[in-house]
Amino acid sequence: MKQVVVATKNMGKVREFAELFERFDLEVKSLHDFPHIEEVEETGETFEENAILKADSLSRQLNAIVIADDSGLIVDALNGKPGVYSARFAGEPKDDQANIDKVLQELNDVAFEKRKARFYCALAVAFPEGDKKPVIVNGTCEGFILEQRRGENGFGYDPIFYVEEYKKAMAELSSDEKNAISHRGRALRKLEEKIPEWFLGE
């Protein structure tokens, strides 16, 4: 079975990748399977830069195909924040609930119709062969920021992200519903079209 390493210790992300790739004969591993490897510091100024940085560095260290994503929440009324700082918007250590609280606080006096936002995902795949350039794709999911949390599913900002298509918060969606419209799901479907056949095991 072919193997790919997902460059994260976030088990929510790992589950999404595993579910989206389960129809392929592909074993998905995460950084939890390689405890000696340190996570790459995200020093890029864009989601794409961070994704390539992580995928490339870890692919060389592990001599493996590595998928890295950098994703986050972009809120128009906050001039694009939290953006590339989404995971640590409220500071270190990373804390989903504190990040949500900070977004809600900063949008406190903003009317719902002006709380437009989107989830953005940049996905990079790096190969151990030096002559193969990383593959990069992206996906977005449009929505609005709710005034309070809803739902128990998902992770990150899902409880405050309202998806008009379903009239629900992202955290109220089933895995299948989320994968159909999520930024990561859309990016992965683009990836399927770009990845060489030997990677997908078809």
Swiss-Prot record:
Its cofactor is Mg(2+). Substrate binds at residues 8-13, 71, 155-158, 178, 183-184. Mg(2+) binds at residues 41, 70. Pyrophosphatase that catalyzes the hydrolysis of nucleoside triphosphates to their monophosphate derivatives, with a high preference for the non-canonical purine nucleotides XTP (xanthosine triphosphate), dITP (deoxyinosine triphosphate) and ITP. Seems to function as a house-cleaning enzyme that removes non-canonical purine nucleotides from the nucleotide pool, thus preventing their incorporation into DNA/RNA and avoiding chromosomal lesions. HAMAP family: Non_canon_purine_NTPase. GO terms for molecular function: dITP diphosphatase activity; ITP diphosphatase activity; metal ion binding; nucleotide binding; ribonucleoside triphosphate phosphatase activity; XTP diphosphatase activity. PANTHER family: INOSINE TRIPHOSPHATE PYROPHOSPHATASE, INOSINE TRIPHOSPHATE PYROPHOSPHATASE/HAM1 PROTEIN. Keywords: Hydrolase, Magnesium, Metal-binding, Nucleotide metabolism, Nucleotide-binding. Homodimer. CDD domains: HAM1. NCBIfam families: PRK14822.1, RdgB/HAM1 family non-canonical purine NTP pyrophosphatase. This is dITP/XTP pyrophosphatase. GO terms for cellular component: cytosol. GO terms for biological process: nucleotide metabolic process; purine nucleoside triphosphate catabolic process. Belongs to the HAM1 NTPase family. The active site is at residue 70. Binds 1 Mg(2+) ion per subunit. It is an enzyme of class 3 (hydrolase).
